[in-house]
C-alpha cells in the first residue's frame, strides 16, 4: 500500500444554481486522464501513480474532492501542495474555451447515454421531481449546462475552493504493510 492524499472542499446541493458550474468544474479538474489534476500529478510532475476526484453533488451539501496515490520517492506534502495548487489555479485563472467545450461535450455524451432505456428516463424524471421539485429540469438542465461560461465556472471556484474551508487528509499505510503476503 502507498500513501494517499485527499483534498476536499464543502459544496452545495444538487439543484442549487451553483451546482451546474460545479459539475463543469468536476469534468475539467478531475474527469479522466485528460483532466487537469491527472495531467499535472501523473504526467507532468510524476508525483502520483494516479489521481481522480469529483464533485459529490447530491440532494444535501457535500464535498468536492481530489485524491492522489503518492508515487514512491515523493512525499505526501509534495502531493498535497500540488493538489492545492491545481485548485488555486482553478480559482484564479479562467478555464479556457477549449476546456469548457470539452467538458460540455463530455456532459452531452453522458446526458445522452444516461437516457437510453425507459428505466434511465424514468430515473431522470423521478430525480427532477424529488430533488428539484420540477419535472422540467429533467430536460431543462441540458440548456443550463450548454450555456455555461468560463466566468460561471470561475465564480463557483472562487466561492467554494477557499483555503478557509479546505480539508487535507493524508492516509498512510500501516507499518509493515509493504511486506509480501504469502
Stretches found by the model and what they are:
Residues 149-152:
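Charged alpha-helix within mobile-element recombinases
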Residues 25-26, 38, 84, 154, ...:
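Generic solvent-exposed, charged/amphipathic alpha-helical segments
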Residues 1-13, 39-147, 166-173, 179-182:
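M16 family metallopeptidases and their MPP-like homologs
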Residues 24, 52-53, 141, 155-157:
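Short beta-alpha junctions and helix-cap segments that line functional grooves
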Residues 154-171:
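Bilobed periplasmic-binding protein-like "clamshell/Venus-flytrap" ligand-binding domains
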Residues 1-34:
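His/Glu-based metal-binding/catalytic segments typifying zinc-dependent metallopeptidases
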Amino acid at each position: 500500500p502507498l500513501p494517499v492524499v485527499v483534498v476536499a472542499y464543502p459544496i452545495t446541493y444538487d439543484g442549487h444554481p451553483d451546482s451546474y458550474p460545479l459539475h463543469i468544474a468536476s469534468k475539467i479538474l478531475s474527469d479522466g486522464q485528460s483532466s487537469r489534476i491527472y495531467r499535472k500529478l501523473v504526467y507532468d510532475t510524476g508525483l502520483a501513480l494516479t489521481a481522480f476526484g469529483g464533485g459529490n453533488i447530491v440532494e444535501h451539501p457535500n464535498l468536492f474532492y481530489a485524491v492522489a496515490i503518492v508515487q514512491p520517492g515523493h512525499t505526501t506534502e509534495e502531493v498535497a501542495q500540488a493538489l492545492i495548487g491545481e485548485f488555486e489555479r482553478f480559482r484564479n485563472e479562467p478555464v479556457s474555451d477549449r476546456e469548457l467545450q470539452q467538458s460540455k461535450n463530455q456532459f452531452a455524451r453522458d446526458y445522452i447515454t444516461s437516457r437510453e432505456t425507459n428505466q434511465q428516463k424514468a430515473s431522470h424524471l423521478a430525480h427532477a421531481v424529488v430533488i428539484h421539485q420540477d419535472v422540467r429540469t429533467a430536460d431543462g438542465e441540458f440548456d443550463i449546462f450548454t450555456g455555461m461560461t468560463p466566468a460561471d465556472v470561475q465564480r463557483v471556484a472562487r466561492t467554494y475552493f477557499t483555503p478557509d474551508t479546505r480539508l487535507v487528509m493524508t492516509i498512510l499505510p500501516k507499518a509493515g504493510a509493504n511486506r509480501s503476503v504469502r
